[in-house]
Amino acid sequence: MTSPRTEGERGEKIAVYAFPLVIIACAAVAFMSPSTFEPVGQYTKQLLMVIMFSMGLTLTIPDLSLVAKRPMPIFLGVICQFVIMPTSALLVAKALELSDAATVGLILLGSVPGGTASNVMAFLAKGDVALSVAMTSVSTLVSPIMTPLLMLWLAGETADVDGKGMMWSLVQTVLIPVGLGLLLRVIASKAVDKVLPVLPWVAIAGIGAVVMAVVSKSQDKLVTVGRIVFVGVAIQNVIGFLFGYYLAKLARERESAARTTAIELSLIHI
């Protein structure tokens, strides 16, 4: 008889390969028929809560204890997030000779914290979900101060950041759902073990729905954006992935922490 852990690992492996295909398909469908999927946008917050609840179900108390005992990866990730990413965004924009508006947008993209997608990908890629959630939380708490300063310094623009709103959103869509998922894992571990194989697909379905909502709402803007801007965003993501992974390795962090740092930097604000 196959154990829940083996079934879960098999489900995760399939989900890793399916994730990009599902996201691309969702984006394409929403782009071609935006009016059909735009109503999904009103449920974005609820979708994010379901996604993060499913991530909480995969965590254990030892996972959190390990992160608490080794804060260096969190520190490294936050430093990279607010030093390497915005600086590299400026360099990429200059190298590609982007317009002033596109340059400001790329720098802003490099100056904001990670999002729910990074937590999901950390789970699918055998990273450290507890570390990913911790990085997202700390970066979000720091960003109301760092993001406006970075925008003013690198782009000469001011950026209004709703600090209280971001923190409350973090509590609603990340901390509470993850905490409830972890609590359920503690008090009903046997029942949770039975649904572990399904959790990757719950996360993928949720992210896919969020992508549909975002693409359908922004379809008109995506049409007017030049291809070179997409190239700049892609390069920025690759830079985040490579720097995150190899700096963590240089710091002699474990493989799961290196993967998590790479994902957290490359999937910023998604």
Say what each PLM segment does.
Residues 1-94, 152, 156-254:
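Structural signature of multi-pass alpha-helical membrane transport proteins
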Residues 86-87, 111-120, 140-149, 153, ...:
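Mid-bilayer segments of alpha-helical transmembrane spans in multi-pass integral membrane proteins
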Residues 268-270:
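Conserved small/polar residues in nucleotide/adenosyl-binding loops
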Residues 71-78, 98-111, 127-137, 163-167, ...:
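The feature identifies polytopic integral membrane transport proteins across all domains of life
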Residues 54, 75, 107-108, 120, ...:
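Hydrophobic/aromatic side chains embedded in well-ordered alpha-helices
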Residues 63-64, 89-96, 104-109, 115-129, ...:
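Generic transmembrane alpha-helix signature in multi-pass membrane proteins
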